[in-house]
């Protein structure tokens, strides 16, 4: 019988030091050295850790491994975006690299599928299987950094920002999200600025309250409707925590945060003739008057079987200008990677659906839905 090895990617600095002390009988500085090899140099072979003595390397090889998700498939967009299908166990999640002139952002998944049922999101149509482990969250960053490193000759920009906006609702995976964020921020890990790591939530108030005062990163909220009636129709989570509960929690978080500079980013996907008329814009402006924010409008990105459409450019423009009349800061997100289905709301993986959600959707809509495995 073989003992399963411990994946060192599952440990933040505190956990790594504790493991080294209790399981290996080693001092904290040895744990720190190994973390540097893993995250600063992308090393996954203990033999290549040249400042670690042979006895410890042998111990590590016997008990431990450094195992990140592997790339099952890579797709390259004409705009430079790369979408990777990352293998996690017997399923896939998607991770997206988005290069821009002054930065390169990595969009990271937190769940296999999604436990929520937002009506406009392709990931939600796949159902839900499980939360990702720490090693599977931070491992996406590790693997992407290595993939980009291998492409240095193409002049690709190193990862400067991470957004938890991939598959899944991050705040329903708090146990594994927090250590992964700690590694992203840690100087022994990826050493990213807290303003360059963003967590997006659809309104899990219990998770946001748990984050408050515990970890400081940029916050984005998926609002997508200016009133409870409409929001509950397109985002059922609103029946659990309504808009006012959600925004009160948001205000508590940004009051405790330096990363947000006193403001939250509001994400609002524009669905043609659903939530994009001028009345909705005025309602949204009024709703957000007591919550310092910048509003990011996201024109809907279509996917197979979706009942929604992208608004016309004129409707998008009118919506933005109406909000700006109320002195809100408003941007329209530039669509990136839509030619490889890597844009916002388009991410899908290889999900063994435990919720039976996909089967129900197929029965309701007909065959034109995203094909997934069902159990």
UniProtKB/Swiss-Prot annotation:
Residues 100-339 form the Radical SAM core domain. One of its GO terms (molecular function) is tRNA (adenine(37)-C2)-methyltransferase activity. [4Fe-4S] cluster binds at residues 114, 118, 121. Disulfide bonds join 107-344. Reaction proceeds by a ping-pong mechanism involving intermediate methylation of a conserved cysteine residue. Keywords: 4Fe-4S, Cytoplasm, Disulfide bond, Iron, Iron-sulfur, Metal-binding, Methyltransferase, rRNA processing, S-adenosyl-L-methionine, Transferase, tRNA processing. Specifically methylates position 2 of adenine 2503 in 23S rRNA and position 2 of adenine 37 in tRNAs. m2A2503 modification seems to play a crucial role in the proofreading step occurring at the peptidyl transferase center and thus would serve to optimize ribosomal fidelity. InterPro entries: Aldolase_TIM, Methyltransferase_A, RlmN_N, RNA_MTrfase_RlmN, rRNA_lsu_MTrfase_RlmN/Cfr, rSAM. Pfam families: Radical_SAM, RlmN_N. Binds 1 [4Fe-4S] cluster. The cluster is coordinated with 3 cysteines and an exchangeable S-adenosyl-L-methionine. Belongs to the radical SAM superfamily. RlmN family. The gene is rlmN. Its EC number is 2.1.1.192. The active site is at residues 94, 344. This is Dual-specificity RNA methyltransferase RlmN.
């Amino acid at each position: 019988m073989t003992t399963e090895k411990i994946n060192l990617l599952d440990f933040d600095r505190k956990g790594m030091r504790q493991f080294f002390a209790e399981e290996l009988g080693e001092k904290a500085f040895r744990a720190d050295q190994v973390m540097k090899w893993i995250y600063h140099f992308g090393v996954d072979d203990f033999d290549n850790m040249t400042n670690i003595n042979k006895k410890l390397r042998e111990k590590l090889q016997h008990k431990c491994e450094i195992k990140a998700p592997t790339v099952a498939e890579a797709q390259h967009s004409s705009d430079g975006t790369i979408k990777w299908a990352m293998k996690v166990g017997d399923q896939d999640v998607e991770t997206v690299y988005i290069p821009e002139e002054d930065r390169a952002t990595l969009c990271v998944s937190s769940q296999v599928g999604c436990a929520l049922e937002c009506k406009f999101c392709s990931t939600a149509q796949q159902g839900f299987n499980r939360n990702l482990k720490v090693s599977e969250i931070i491992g996406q960053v590790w693997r992407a950094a290595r993939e980009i490193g291998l492409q240095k000759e193409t002049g690709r920009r190193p990862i400067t920002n991470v957004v938890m906006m991939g598959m899944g609702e991050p705040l329903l995976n708090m146990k594994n999200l927090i250590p992964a964020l700690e590694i992203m921020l840690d100087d022994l890990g990826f050493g990213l600025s807290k303003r360059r790591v963003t967590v997006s939530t659809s309104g899990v108030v219990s998770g946001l309250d748990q984050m408050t005062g515990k970890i400081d990163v940029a916050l984005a909220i998926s609002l997508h409707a200016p009133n409870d009636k409409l929001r509950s129709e397109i985002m059922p989570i609103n029946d659990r925590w309504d808009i006012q509960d959600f925004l009160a929690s948001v205000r508590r978080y940004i009051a405790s945060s330096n990363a947000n500079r006193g403001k939250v980013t509001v994400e609002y996907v524009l669905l043609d003739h659903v939530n994009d008329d001028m009345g909705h814009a005025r309602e949204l402006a009024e709703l957000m008057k007591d919550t310092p924010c910048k509003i990011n409008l996201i024109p809907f990105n279509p996917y197979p079987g979706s009942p929604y459409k992208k608004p016309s450019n004129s409707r998008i423009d009118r919506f933005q200008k109406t909000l700006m009349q109320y002195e809100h800061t408003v941007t329209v997100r530039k669509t990136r990677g839509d030619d490889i289905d890597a844009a916002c709301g388009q991410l899908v993986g290889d999900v063994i659906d435990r919720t039976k959600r996909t089967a129900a959707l197929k029965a309701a809509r007909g065959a034109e839905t995203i094909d997934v495995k069902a159990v």
